[in-house]
C-alpha cells in the first residue's frame, strides 16, 4: 500500500531540521502549547515539525482555493522574510508588501495603497500586528508563521516554526509556494522536484560578498603579497647592520640646561 501523497518525504523533514525550523524560543504562549514537542535542558522549546508540515498543507489548500491569486497578500516587515514574500508573490501570482505596512491599507479607501484582499499571509504576528489588526476589522482570514512565543490573536491558521531565522523563514515560504503550485497543477506530479531551490528564498545581506570563494582567494593573495614585502624589507635591513642609524633631524639634547642667572632680564614696558 502506497503512502498518502500529502505525507512529508524524508527530504522535507531533513530540510526542516537543517534550517532549524524546529528551534523555538524559551517562552510559550498558551495557544501554542500543542505545537511544542519538548523542552531542552537550556529552556528552549522544540517545535513538532509534523505539526509544521500539517499547517503548511492546510495553508496551501486555502491559498489555492482563492480564484484570483492577486487577492492573496503576503506581508513581511521582518527583514529575513522580505525576500521570501517577494519570491512567493512572483511564483504564485500573489501581492507582496515587503517592509513597512502603511496603516489604513485595508480600512481607509482614500489612501493610494488601499487593498481589498481575500486572504492575508504574514511572516511574524508581532511585527505585522498592524496588518492583522486591520484584517480583523474587515473580516480577512489570516495565515501566520508563529513561534512558540508569538501572539495568535486574530490569526486563523498558525504555522508553527522558527520565524526569526533567515533559513527557517525562507524554507517555510518555499514549501508553501511549492505546495500551492502542486495543488494548482503547475507541477505535473508530486514526485517531480521543483526546479527552484530553497536558497532563492533565503535572505541575503547586501554587504556580504556574493562569492565567498573569490573573497577568500583575494584575501589569500593579499596575505602572500604582504608576507613577501615583509621578507624583502627584513633582508634589506639585514645587509646594513654596519651602518649606524642616522640621528633624527629634529633631535635635541634635553639633558643640557642653561644658566638663567646670566641671561639678560626682559625689558619692562613703561
From Swiss-Prot:
Keyword Transmembrane: no
Region feature Disordered, mapped onto this chain: 207-270
Gene Ontology MF term list: structural constituent of ribosome
Keyword Ribosomal protein included in the entry's annotation: yes
One Gene Ontology biological process: cytoplasmic translation
Bias type Acidic residues, positions: 207-225
UniProt feature, compositional bias: Low complexity: 226-258
GO cellular component, one term: cytosolic small ribosomal subunit
Tree of life domain: Eukaryota
Subcellular location: Cytoplasm
Keywords assigned by UniProt, alphabetized: Cytoplasm, Ribonucleoprotein, Ribosomal protein
Entry-linked HAMAP family: Ribosomal_S2_euk
Complex and partners: Component of the small ribosomal subunit. Mature ribosomes consist of a small (40S) and a large (60S) subunit. The 40S subunit contains about 33 different proteins and 1 molecule of RNA (18S). The 60S subunit contains about 49 different proteins and 3 molecules of RNA (25S, 5.8S and 5S). Interacts with RPS21.
NCBIfam families: uS2_euk_arch
Family stated for the protein in its record: Belongs to the universal ribosomal protein uS2 family.
Function of the molecule: Required for the assembly and/or stability of the 40S ribosomal subunit. Required for the processing of the 20S rRNA-precursor to mature 18S rRNA in a late step of the maturation of 40S ribosomal subunits.
Official protein name in the record: Small ribosomal subunit protein uS2
Originating organism: Yarrowia lipolytica (strain CLIB 122 / E 150) (Yeast)
Gene that encodes the chain: RPS0
Amino acid at each position: 500500500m502506497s503512502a498518502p501523497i500529502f505525507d512529508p518525504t524524508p527530504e522535507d523533514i531533513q530540510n526542516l531540521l537543517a534550517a532549524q525550523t524546529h528551534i523555538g524560543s524559551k517562552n510559550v504562549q498558551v495557544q501554542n502549547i500543542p505545537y511544542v514537542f519538548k523542552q531542552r535542558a537550556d529552556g528552549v522549546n522544540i517545535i513538532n515539525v509534523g505539526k509544521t508540515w500539517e499547517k503548511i498543507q492546510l495553508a496551501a489548500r486555502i491559498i489555492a482555493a482563492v480564484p484570483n491569486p492577486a487577492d492573496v497578500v503576503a506581508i513581511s516587515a521582518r527583514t529575513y522574510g522580505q525576500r521570501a514574500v517577494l519570491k512567493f508573490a512572483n511564483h504564485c501570482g500573489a501581492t507582496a508588501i515587503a517592509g513597512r505596512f502603511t496603516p489604513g491599507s485595508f480600512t481607509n479607501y482614500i489612501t493610494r495603497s488601499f487593498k481589498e484582499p481575500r486572504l492575508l499571509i504574514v511572516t511574524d504576528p508581532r511585527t505585522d500586528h498592524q496588518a492583522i489588526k486591520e484584517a480583523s476589522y474587515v473580516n480577512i482570514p489570516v495565515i501566520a508563521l508563529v513561534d512558540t512565543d508569538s501572539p495568535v490573536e486574530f490569526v486563523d491558521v498558525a504555522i508553527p516554526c522558527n520565524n526569526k531565522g533567515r533559513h527557517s523563514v525562507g524554507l517555510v515560504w518555499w514549501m508553501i509556494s511549492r505546495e500551492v503550485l502542486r495543488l494548482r497543477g503547475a507541477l505535473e506530479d508530486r514526485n517531480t522536484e521543483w526546479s527552484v531551490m530553497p536558497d532563492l528564498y533565503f535572505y541575503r545581506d547586501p554587504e556580504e560578498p556574493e562569492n565567498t570563494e573569490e573573497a577568500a582567494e583575494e584575501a589569500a593573495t593579499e596575505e602572500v603579497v604582504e608576507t613577501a614585502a615583509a621578507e624583502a624589507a627584513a633582508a634589506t635591513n639585514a645587509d646594513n647592520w654596519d651602518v649606524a642609524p642616522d640621528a633624527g633631524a629634529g633631535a635635541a639634547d634635553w639633558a643640557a640646561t642653561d644658566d638663567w642667572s646670566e641671561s639678560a632680564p626682559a625689558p619692562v614696558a613703561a
